[in-house]
A protein has these predicted regions:
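Active-site recognition of the HExxH zinc-binding catalytic motif
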Residues: 247, 375-395, 417, 422, ...
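Catalytic zinc-binding patch centered on the HExxH motif and its immediate surroundings
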Residues: 311-313, 346-366
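Short pre-active-site segment immediately N-terminal to the catalytic Zn-binding motif
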Residues: 313, 363-385
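Post-HExxH zinc-binding segment in Zn-dependent metallohydrolases
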Residues: 408-437, 445-447, 451, 525
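C-terminal, non-catalytic "cap/extension" segments appended to globular domains
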Residues: 6-7, 20, 112, 136-142, ...
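Long, K/E/R/D-enriched contiguous segments that form extended
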Residues: 290-325, 334, 369, 393, ...
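A well-structured
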Residues: 1-308, 319
Length: 594
């Protein structure tokens, strides 16, 4: 692996445009300290008059903006050299600064909520500049009916350290205390199975290896079913109790409230998948036939179908491809993509001690940088266009909004990146003359829809059902959890797949069940992206304009309302229906090529 000094600068991040020297960095750091001290002076006088109110709100966002910039710089720097202790210390320094700000700004929300919104309206008339922060203030008031008295909030805060430990215990136990028997790989070599290499061996072309991997893993999980049942039950009880304390009807309602999402969006997704369950049954039948199996078991599901595809795309070739793919968008979009590619927004190649993987990251006052570890594979090109989607979303969101309205929610975070991925796949399917490449892309797409919509929706249904039991004062025993999970697998895989008994323990190894109703967002994100791409490719009137307007929304609108700007209404089940119909179309295209 190369050292950074051996990489052409044009393939590396330019972080000097953030801070060119330590003096500039220290100046902003000291400025944050000064502003925190200024903010603290308003602790007891914030709501006394419109000027104090304005100064407090303005200062708080100025501090957050500066901390974001500092935090971005130190974290990007650290990710380029994770062995650098000085950079690690800088990360901790800024993390401590963020904590200091939190400690000294805690009074803002309680101070605001002690007053009726009429007071805010009065202050806005006296000082029109306060209207710049109206959306953020209204978001605070949205939680008023779920906010407790000062005494109750302090009491709840004091026990906060005891809440959320279930996940920490779960991770430690699963990753540190569990050990698995060895299996023999394809060459007869003994290898110790673990949670990390399980995915490697469950995709083996050798069915014996897959079966041994599956049975060995779940044999170990079976031993600890009662422990995992206790952990997930504790987590659900914590959520349910917090929901009741904060005046929500259920744990799921509390979790969805953060994104201003109605529970019917969650339930519509599950209903749509149920309506189109036959599509995934057809996919498993196709896989069974291609693998030439008399019967297909759960340990056969993850083996790739078709021949391996190893076409190389150099980074320069990938740049050319994605520019052609993204020509469907307006001039500003393409101009900014070219700037990203040519102006050192992207750190391209793997180097010694560089963070692995890929991401898009930045702040309001920096480029929306992209980290890659490019190695000339198709997946690397796909990662580039995926992360470019994130970065362009960030560009539009920040460029068309003031800081306080510029951060889009996690609920919509994967939409823009997935739109780009889907556009790449459709472009290559249209322009490639290589049948194997087309089959490879179609297989990737089928797996994307299987894993992101069908599998994540099964998880979402399980999570909804077990939380309902706790909300209604029921008990989650090991047997009940395992039986519920097994029955869901029977439905989601159908009669055409042998649903091995061991799968009843799979829920024990899914960390997302501790993420508080998060997984459905993967499915809604892909559903929304599919609808957007369909509109663009079908040249639907204003499809591109509406999509760009969605990218510009930031946090001015709720996630559901911002997607409506793009022409996608997730309160309507037709969005998920369309995505699942697209899965069926992809399946049929693949069948036509074999």
């Amino acid at each position: 692996m190369k050292d950074r000094k051996d990489i052409d600068k044009k393939y590396t991040w330019n972080l000097d445009v953030i801070y060119s020297n330590t003096t500039e960095f220290d100046k902003d750091y000291d400025l944050v300290i000064d502003k925190i001290n200024s903010l603290k002076k308003y602790e007891n006088t914030m709501m006394d008059n419109s000027d104090n109110f304005y100064d407090s709100i303005r200062l708080s966002f100025e501090i957050e903006r500066l901390i974001d910039k500092l935090y971005c710089y130190v974290n990007l720097s650290f990710d380029l050299d994770t062995s650098n202790n000085n950079k690690q210390e800088l990360c901790e320094k800024i993390s401590n600064l963020r904590s200091k700000y939190s400690e000294n700004s805690y009074f803002i929300v309680p101070s605001i909520l002690k007053n009726d919104y009429g007071v805010i309206e009065k202050y806005m008339k006296e000082n029109p500049l306060i209207k710049d922060y109206e959306i953020s203030i209204k978001e605070i008031y949205r939680y008023k009916e779920h906010t407790l008295s000062d005494t109750e909030e302090k009491l709840l805060s004091s026990i906060g350290k005891m809440v959320g430990n279930s996940y920490d215990t779960y991770e430690l136990f699963k990753d540190c205390d569990m050990s698995f028997d060895s299996i023999e790989d394809e060459n007869g070599k003994k290898v110790e199975l673990n949670n990390s290499n399980y995915s490697l061996y469950i995709e083996s072309k050798d069915r014996r290896v897959r079966k041994d991997t599956f049975n060995t893993l779940y044999k170990e999980y079976k031993k600890y079913t009662n422990t995992f049942a206790s952990l997930i039950s504790s987590n659900m009880k914590e959520l349910s109790t917090l929901a009741k304390i904060n005046k929500y009807n259920s744990a799921i309602e509390m979790s969805l409230y953060a994104d201003d999402v109605d529970i019917k969006v969650y339930n519509n997704l599950i209903d749509s998948v149920h309506k189109h369950i036959d599509y995934i049954y057809d996919y498993y039948k196709l896989k069974k036939d291609i693998l030439n199996l008399n019967d297909i078991h759960l340990y056969d599901i993850y083996v790739p179908i078709g021949n391996s595809f190893d076409k190389k795309y150099s980074y320069e070739e990938a740049k050319d491809v994605i520019l052609k793919v993204l020509e469907v968008f307006e001039d500003e979009y393409i101009t900014k993509v070219k700037e990203a590619l040519d102006n050192r927004w992207i750190d391209v190649y793997p180097t010694k001690n560089k963070r692995t993987g890929g991401y898009s990251g930045g702040s309001y006052d920096t480029y929306p940088y992209i980290l890659l570890n490019y190695q000339d594979k198709y997946n690397d090109m796909s990662t580039l266009i995926h992360e470019m989607g994130h970065s362009m979303h960030s560009y539009y969101s920040r460029n068309y909004n003031d800081y306080q309205n510029s951060e889009y929610r996690i609920f919509v975070a994967e939409v823009a990146s997935t739109v780009n991925e889907l556009l790449l796949s459709h472009y290559l399917l249209e322009h490639s003359s290589d049948v194997e490449e087309k089959k490879y892309i179609l297989n990737n797409l089928m797996e994307l829809y299987r894993a992101t919509i069908y599998r994540q929706t099964m998880f979402a249904e399980f999570e909804r059902d077990i939380s309902s039991i706790i909300d209604n004062d029921g008990a989650l025993t090991a047997d009940k959890l395992s039986n519920m999970y097994y029955d869901l697998n029977k439905f989601y895989f159908g009669n055409g797949v042998v649903v091995d008994d061991e799968i009843r323990y799979e829920w024990e190894r899914i960390p997302h069940f501790y993420y508080d109703f998060y997984v459905y967002k993967y499915a809604t994100g892909l559903s929304a992206a599919t609808a957007i791409v369909k509109g663009i490719l079908d040249k639907k009137e204003n499809a591109v304009k509406n999509y760009i307007d969605f990218l510009k929304c930031g946090s001015r609108l709720s996630p559901i309302e911002s997607l409506k700007v793009a022409g996608v209404d997730l309160t309507n089940s037709s969005v998920a229906d369309t995505a699942l119909d697209e899965f069926k179309n992809i399946l049929d295209m693949y069948k036509s090529m074999i």
